[in-house]
Amino acid sequence: MRFTVKQIVWLKVLLHLAGFLPLVWLFWAGHQGYFSADPAKDIQHFTGRMALKFLLATLLVSPLARYAKQPLLIRVRRLLGLWCFAWATLHLTSYTLLELGINNLALLGSEIITRPYLTLGMISWAILLALAVTSTQAMQRKLGRRWQLLHNFVYLVAILAPIHYLWSVKIVSPQPVVYALLAAGLLTWRYKKFRQWWRAIR
């Protein structure tokens, strides 16, 4: 049985809750003192993982819609992508304000240049920003064929973001490895699309 338009609307509501409620929990956990001795790191990793989860969910939509024969499922892809950008922005903001401090914002540029994992993270965020800004139907019409080429840069984010996570942790734990493997699996699943995009930008 295929999804109806009404069911997709309810699915969007659930996905919005999945994006918003963790933010509520984050504020509540901070207020209750549930974080470790280094709450700044906890918040950075939490927001980063949320961005990765929505990134992986975004990449999953197209192949899932195709193989499950659920064409209307494509309608949730933009929503997932915007939540990915929102959490990535919170991730960047938490690093800037909690790690560097509001009085040291000028250091952000040099930090990005001198720390490779931050370089990858910033490139990923910049791509997500471009995708979010151009995600509307009006921008899709305006950009024409270039729109799809631009939005296929999500594949690059799927490569860089897990590496950023792996490099950012001092001790390699299973969690960043799992995210990297999931991203690799999704890129493999979408190998033909990924190869077409790679050839187009070379």
UniProtKB/Swiss-Prot annotation:
InterPro entries, alphabetized: Fe3_Rdtase_TM_dom, MsrQ-like
Name the UniProt record assigns to this protein: Protein-methionine-sulfoxide reductase heme-binding subunit MsrQ
Organism placement in taxonomy: Bacteria, Pseudomonadati, Pseudomonadota, Gammaproteobacteria, Enterobacterales
HAMAP family: MsrQ (MF_01207)
Predominant cellular place of this UniProt entry's protein: membrane
Gene Ontology BP term (one): protein repair
Membrane-spanning ranges: 8-28, 82-102, 116-136, 149-169, 171-191
Keywords: Cell inner membrane, Cell membrane, Electron transport, Flavoprotein, FMN, Heme, Iron, Membrane, Metal-binding, Transmembrane, Transmembrane helix, Transport
GO cellular component, one term: plasma membrane
Name of the gene encoding the protein in the UniProt record: msrQ
Membrane-protein topology: Multi-pass membrane protein
UniProt-annotated location(s): Cell inner membrane
Family of this protein: Belongs to the MsrQ family.
Function of the protein: Part of the MsrPQ system that repairs oxidized periplasmic proteins containing methionine sulfoxide residues (Met-O), using respiratory chain electrons. Thus protects these proteins from oxidative-stress damage caused by reactive species of oxygen and chlorine generated by the host defense mechanisms. MsrPQ is essential for the maintenance of envelope integrity under bleach stress, rescuing a wide series of structurally unrelated periplasmic proteins from methionine oxidation.
